[in-house]
């Protein structure tokens, strides 16, 4: 019985968790799951995402609200705008999860009605894209999306079982007309390919799920084996990866370490072609080169023996402000905050705090803060002037951060580079 299956899944994965949000489309899968969850006496809310892609979208939202009202389950409606640049399916999925991320609470888990047949489709779509073992792992019963957890308790339940239960219970649900459009890849598999395959091999979906699980286990093992080395080379707080030793690694190891680092930094996974471009243009670049590559919403940049993952960095306007003892100064464009404590300077940025002790002669002295300096500069306490570029290099400030790094001056002498 489906209810028994569901209870077993909850006891196994979330024995103490009580707060859940159901992604409710109004289709047969999520309607069945809604009724099942209502019997478990959980702290449950349901969210319906209004994509605005169908003329029936308003009716679907109203239907979901009525069902939830009847079951006394709090209902949330979220309207989204779908970015179609990456395709309607991908755009709708991204908009859906972003909207859910806006309403889900830290103590809640998202529950979705993905089932065994969905798993087969996901696996075959990954196969079509040429995915490796991570992609071929398809979906897991418990997954993550940015800041929340996703639970798929019906992943081992077939569509036929769900349909049978819905008919037995005389549920009503909505039919999305786009599900019959085989122009979409997933629908093509569902409507044209899998019915023929299942006629030939009755347990095809179960075997695909088994293969996906094998891939997931291999991926977990790979991550476990590389965990220590990743920890050695990666600084996740700074989104930085030391690649000095990478040329002596095999290509496969280079690829996996870069993939794992990018994933843990929250970046979109590169394609195989992009990954090869990253390796060729960064790992094997001359040490004096500073290549940079666009990766979705991020930039991948190399400086000396490190890779850095950054967002789009805007160049701030010219900045020059005095900093007196016992005074604070907020820098523009999120660059941070400075405090002059008399005997030291505190530089605070993104939760990280550095304390720079002033020379005795400069205790309580008025200072000056700049974000850039051209030409030569005299370091405080040293007789010779030298190029500012050399001072940046000595302080290991990457090229793209040099106009976003505070410089502390006493008159025309450089006291600190705050990096």
From Swiss-Prot:
Catalytic activity: cytidine(34) in tRNA(Ile2) + L-lysine + ATP = lysidine(34) in tRNA(Ile2) + AMP + diphosphate + H(+)
Localization terms from the record: Cytoplasm
Cellular component terms (Gene Ontology): cytoplasm
InterPro entries: Lysidine-tRNA-synth_C, Rossmann-like_a/b/a_fold, TilS/TtcA_N, tRNA_Ile_lys_synt, tRNA_Ile_lys_synt_N, tRNA_Ile_lys_synt_subst-bd
Broad class of enzyme this protein falls into: ligase
GO BP terms, alphabetized: tRNA modification
Subcellular location, principal: cytoplasm
EC code(s) of this entry: 6.3.4.19
Pfam families: ATP_bind_3, TilS, TilS_C
Residue positions binding ATP: 25-30
Domain of life assignment: Bacteria
GO molecular function: ATP binding; tRNA(Ile)-lysidine synthase activity
Presence of the UniProt keyword Transmembrane helix in the record: no
Alphabetical keyword list: ATP-binding, Cytoplasm, Ligase, Nucleotide-binding, tRNA processing
Function text: Ligates lysine onto the cytidine present at position 34 of the AUA codon-specific tRNA(Ile) that contains the anticodon CAU, in an ATP-dependent manner. Cytidine is converted to lysidine, thus changing the amino acid specificity of the tRNA from methionine to isoleucine.
Domain notes: The N-terminal region contains the highly conserved SGGXDS motif, predicted to be a P-loop motif involved in ATP binding.
NCBIfam families registered for this protein in UniProt: lysidine_TilS_C, lysidine_TilS_N
Family to which the UniProt record says this protein belongs: Belongs to the tRNA(Ile)-lysidine synthase family.
Protein name as catalogued: tRNA(Ile)-lysidine synthase
């Amino acid at each position: 019985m489906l209810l028994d299956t569901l209870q077993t899944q909850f006891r196994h994965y979330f024995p103490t968790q009580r707060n859940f949000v159901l992604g409710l489309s109004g289709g047969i899968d999520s309607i069945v799951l809604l009724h099942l969850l209502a019997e478990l006496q959980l702290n449950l809310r349901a969210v319906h995402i209004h994509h605005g892609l169908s003329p029936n979208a308003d009716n679907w939202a109203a239907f979901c609200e009525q069902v939830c009202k009847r079951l006394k389950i709090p209902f949330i409606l979220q309207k989204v705008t779908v970015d179609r640049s990456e395709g309607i399916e991908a755009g709708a999925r991204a908009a859906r999860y972003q909207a859910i991320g806006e309403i889900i609470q830290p103590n809640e888990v998202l529950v979705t009605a993905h089932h065994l047949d969905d798993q087969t489709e996901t696996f075959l779509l990954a196969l079509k894209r040429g995915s490796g073992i991570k992609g071929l792992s398809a979906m897991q019963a418990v997954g993550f999306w940015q800041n929340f957890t996703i639970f798929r308790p019906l992943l081992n339940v077939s569509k036929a079982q769900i349909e049978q239960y819905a008919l037995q219970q005389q549920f009503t649900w909505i039919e999305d007309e786009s599900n019959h459009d085989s122009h979409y890849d997933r629908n093509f598999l569902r409507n044209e390919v899998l019915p023929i395959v299942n006629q030939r091999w009755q347990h095809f979906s179960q075997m695909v799920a088994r293969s996906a699980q094998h891939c997931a286990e291999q991926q977990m093992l790979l991550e476990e084996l590389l965990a220590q080395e990743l920890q050695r080379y990666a600084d996740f707080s700074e989104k930085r990866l030391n690649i000095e030793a990478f040329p002596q690694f095999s290509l496969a190891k280079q690829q996996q370490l870069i993939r794992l680092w990018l994933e843990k930094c929250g970046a979109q996974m590169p394609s195989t072609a992009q990954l090869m471009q990253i390796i060729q243009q960064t790992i094997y670049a001359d040490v004096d080169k500073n290549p940079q590559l666009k990766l979705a919403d991020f930039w991948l940049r190399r400086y000396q023996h490190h890779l850095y993952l950054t967002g789009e960095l805007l160049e701030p306007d010219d900045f020059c402000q005095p900093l007196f003892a016992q005074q604070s100064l907020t820098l523009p464009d999120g660059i941070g905050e400075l405090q002059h404590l008399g005997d030291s300077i505190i530089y605070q940025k993104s939760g990280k705090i550095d304390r720079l002790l002033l020379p005795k002669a400069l205790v309580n002295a008025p200072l000056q803060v700049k974000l850039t300096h051209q030409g030569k500069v005299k370091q405080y306490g040293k007789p010779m002037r030298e190029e500012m570029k050399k001072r940046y290099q000595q302080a290991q400030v990457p090229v793209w951060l040099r106009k976003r790094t505070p410089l502390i001056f006493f008159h025309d002498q450089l006291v600190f580079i705050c990096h």
